[in-house]
């Protein structure tokens, strides 16, 4: 709750939102601890709560009618992503999660070098297995190979597909691949990270324009821990090619 303009009405609304989230989590048999916090602004409140509770994953939900650009991107996103290195997901669902038929994941070049790479792959493979829906990865050839290796090693039971996305600018070509009952996941990156690309700055506007009628998740990988090195991956790829 923003301490600068808090009121009894806003406090009650915040409590109702927490209770609604707790009910949804309870239906999925997920334990929830409800926390109300007063702070100077939303980003500061989230960042301090992450530290106090040692949160490892941050999920921010947007209202189904909200514009993803106006609701999150801007000062809030910049402050939050600078304030924590933990994995951040911005989610907007237009339909119940258990009715999704497919998860489409757009992966940028060099995403395999981020320290949170295996973590988010596991998230969505597990999600696909639980929901009984196919997980379809789109990436350039090198990155797609690393995704395939990881899925084969750790999540072989998950129904998956893999398609080449030669250029990140071709993201708009996915409009023909994503239906209303699909979830589109876009793996982004923090400014200055190894997989960051300046084209990410246009991403919110593109998603708002071309995928406004789709359920969306934008994920910023975990930067916590040791990043995967080029040397390590190149050595792995060399061994793989020789087998």
Question: What kind of region is each of these model predictions?
Answer:
Residues 231-240:
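Conserved small/polar residues in nucleotide/adenosyl-binding loops
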Residues 55-56, 180-183:
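Local beta-strand N-terminus motif with an aromatic residue
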Residues 146, 166-179, 195-208:
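A short, acidic, amphipathic alpha-helical segment used as a generic capping/interface helix at domain edges
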Residues 62-79, 187-206, 221-229:
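Glycine-rich, Arg-bearing micro-motifs that act as flexible, cationic patches
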Residues 1-146, 153-155, 161-175:
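Structured cytosolic domains appended to multi-pass membrane proteins
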Residues 128-131, 208-212:
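Short, conserved loop/helix-junction motifs that constitute active-site signature segments
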Residues 183, 210-217:
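C-terminal functional regions that serve as terminal interaction/effector modules
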């Amino acid at each position: 709750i923003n301490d600068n303009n808090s009121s009894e009405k806003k406090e009650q609304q915040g409590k109702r939102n927490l209770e609604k989230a707790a009910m949804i989590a309870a239906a999925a048999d997920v334990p929830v601890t409800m926390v109300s916090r007063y702070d100077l602004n939303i980003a500061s409140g989230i960042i301090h709560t992450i530290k106090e509770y040692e949160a490892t994953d941050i999920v921010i939900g947007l209202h189904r009618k909200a514009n993803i650009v106006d609701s999150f991107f801007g000062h809030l996103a910049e402050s939050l992503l600078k304030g924590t290195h933990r994995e951040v997901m911005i989610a907007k669902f237009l339909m119940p999660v258990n009715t999704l038929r497919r998860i489409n994941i757009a992966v940028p070049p060099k995403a395999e070098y981020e320290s949170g790479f295996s973590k988010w792959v596991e998230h969505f493979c597990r999600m696909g297995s639980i929901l009984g829906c196919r997980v379809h990865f789109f990436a350039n050839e090198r990155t797609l190979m690393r995704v395939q290796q990881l899925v084969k090693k750790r999540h072989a039971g998950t129904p998956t597909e893999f398609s080449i996305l030669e250029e990140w600018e071709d993201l708009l070509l996915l409009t023909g691949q994503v239906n209303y009952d699909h979830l589109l996941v876009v793996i982004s990156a923090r400014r200055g990270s190894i997989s960051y690309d300046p084209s990410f700055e246009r991403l919110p506007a593109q998603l708002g324009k071309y995928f406004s009628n789709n359920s969306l998740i934008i994920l910023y990988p975990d930067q916590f821990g040791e990043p995967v090195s080029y040397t390590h991956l190149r050595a792995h790829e060399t061994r793989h090619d020789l087998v």
